[in-house]
Amino acid sequence: VKSLAERAETELGGVDILVNNAGITKDGLFVRMSDADWDAVLEVDLTSVFRLTRELTHPMMRRRFGRIINITSIVGVTGNPGQANYCAAKAGMIGLSKSLAQEIASRNITVNCIAPGFIESAMTDKLNDKQKETIMGAIPMRRMGTGAEVAASALFLASNEAAYVTGQTIHVNGGMAMI
């Protein structure tokens, strides 16, 4: 991670906008979840965010500008049966973002989260028709979101129009959870 940050600095002139969007799931009932499944999800979904953000924050602080956008999940706020590891990682990302936002806001660096609900993706393509029907029934807009809708939120948070927005979580979920 350190060499990646150094290369970005020397070859690209630095990173002004960081979008942390890595994530995996290894779902299972809490009482049956293995340490390996717990650790794997937290490593990818939370620890990698910590490590990469830590390395890229120092140069942003020197430049006195940056936008850090963490893609979390609605289940990081609401919880979800069978996803204790994923929910814990995504909730941790929200807490990390709020803490970091308070630490570095004075350096003109914003830190925010986007919490998508059900978005058309390879993950939701795996759901059967009955599961999709149940999900749609819980979403007031009666459809899944699109990657473009999530990207539009990221574009806003990266823009000058969001210069006074920090420590926030934008929920992109069609009204599924009105928080």
Q: Can you describe what each PLM-predicted range is?
A:
Residues 53, 89, 97:
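Active-site helix of classical SDR
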Residues 139-150, 161:
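A conserved structural motif in NAD(P)-dependent oxidoreductases
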Residues 29-30, 37-42, 124, 135:
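Substrate-binding pocket helix/loop in short-chain dehydrogenase/reductase
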Residues 19, 105, 110, 165-167, ...:
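Short, small/polar-rich loop/turn modules that mediate ligand/substrate recognition or access, typified
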Residues 58, 102-106, 163:
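Alpha-helical segment proximal to the catalytic Tyr-Lys
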Residues 73:
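Residue(s) in the substrate-gating loop at a strand-loop-helix junction
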Residues 78-81, 155, 166-179:
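Short C-terminal tail/terminal secondary-structure segment
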